[in-house]
Amino acid sequence: MVNKNINDIPPILCCSNIIKRYQYSNFSITVLDGITMSIEYNKIIAIIGASGSGKSTLLHIMGGLDKPTSGDVFLEGRALNKLSDKDCSIMRNTSIGFIYQFHHLLPDFSVLENIAMPLLIKGLKFAIAKHKAQFILELIGLNNLCDRYPCELSGGESQRVAVARAIINNPPLVLADEPTGNLDESNSNNVFKLLEKINLWYGTTFVIATHDLSLAKKCHKIYIVSNGMLKISTI
């Protein structure tokens, strides 16, 4: 058996000449203008840029939540933007986790039920989903929050629960849009440390859109989005 060199392993995510243009009645706005990039497995990547620079739009296109005007997005070799809505939805639920600035936890469900929700959507029985959710909570040190509801959590606790929900399906890729943007410095550090642990334990790839330069500097690589263009930061 021939051992593959790490350089022979294809990237988990590729964006090829991504253009995103919004067309209005008598004018158009180009938000992304020819973005090409590759994301390696097992990395934590930051995408930084000013508000309105297009970093969130890029993240949504990477996750199949939006389609580019032209260009392609490949996730583990499959062109996301060429999939049917149904197939894209299935791939998102099995291969991609999402974390947002606001946790979007369902208020009428407990922490355990919120974390188990992606598994229930996937069709797993509640007993199995509950067991896996309990395991994740114990793994990240939040098992004491199991029966609480979102209204009973602090901001930092809510966001760590959102992280747990994002990894419950063990996706190879997690996309995080300003995951610490609503938190103070202490809670921001705690959330990022959790992402680092998950990256180390599971080899999960994280792509984080953020305006927090101190957070970005902790990542393996930083990309800058400016005027619709992308470049690698040397910060």
Swiss-Prot record:
Stated name of the protein: Lipoprotein-releasing system ATP-binding protein LolD
Keywords recorded for this protein, A-Z: ATP-binding, Cell inner membrane, Cell membrane, Membrane, Nucleotide-binding, Translocase, Transport
PANTHER family: ALPHA-D-RIBOSE 1-METHYLPHOSPHONATE 5-TRIPHOSPHATE SYNTHASE SUBUNIT PHNL, LIPOPROTEIN-RELEASING SYSTEM ATP-BINDING PROTEIN LOLD
Subcellular location: Cell inner membrane
Gene (UniProt): lolD
GO cellular component: plasma membrane
The keyword Nuclease is annotated on this UniProt entry: no
Record organism: Blochmanniella floridana
Residue ranges of coiled coil: none
GO MF annotation: an example: ATP binding
InterPro entries, per the entry: AAA+_ATPase (IPR003593), ABC_transporter-like_ATP-bd (IPR003439), ABC_transporter-like_CS (IPR017871), MacB-like_ATP-bd (IPR017911), P-loop_NTPase (IPR027417)
SMART domains: AAA (SM00382)
Membrane topology, record value: Peripheral membrane protein
ABC transporter domain boundaries: 13-235
Functional summary from the UniProt entry: Part of the ABC transporter complex LolCDE involved in the translocation of mature outer membrane-directed lipoproteins, from the inner membrane to the periplasmic chaperone, LolA. Responsible for the formation of the LolA-lipoprotein complex in an ATP-dependent manner.
Binding locations of ATP: G49, A50, S51, G52, S53, G54, K55, S56
UniProt cross-references to Pfam families, sorted A to Z: ABC_tran
Subunit structure: The complex is composed of two ATP-binding proteins (LolD) and two transmembrane proteins (LolC and LolE).
Entry EC number(s): 7.6.2.-
Listed PROSITE patterns: ABC_TRANSPORTER_1 (PS00211), ABC_TRANSPORTER_2 (PS50893), LOLD (PS51244)
Sequence similarity: Belongs to the ABC transporter superfamily. Lipoprotein translocase (TC 3.A.1.125) family.
